[in-house]
Amino acid sequence: RTFQATCDAALGDARCRVDLEDPAYKGTGAVIDLLRDRTFTASGLGGFEAGWFTFGTVDWTSGANAGRRTEVLGHDVTDGVAILTLLEAPVRPIIATDAFVVRAGCHKRIATCGTKFANVASFRGFPHIPGQDAVLRYATKDGGHEGAVL
């Protein structure tokens, strides 16, 4: 383990304890139209807000990529239609009607863990560890910390 502000657990693993099979964190959809080699519009995801599946995964259930998993780089919603951008283009081309299961993603920050998953008790990071700005601060005569003995 490393001491870092972000969580080092994988979303849904034994340390994280989020159930990714819960319908709140999982959606089923189909490709409507391919916008680029790794970006497509999808049906079936109307109940999820933009960003819900960012950093999540897509498991292909039909088409040439059936049985493969791909990571989601971004999830947008435009005029009620979901747009998914994958981290990498799948091995085989995506075509309209390819079906998939998509699972929520996590930003690895304590705020996401609390608001999106209500799972702060299982957060595996150190959110209060000082950042680089604490190392770069120095005492000044006019500031609250002038360098005198406390």
Q: Locations of the language-model features?
A:
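Interface-prone segments of viral and bacterial extracellular assemblies
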Residues: 1-150
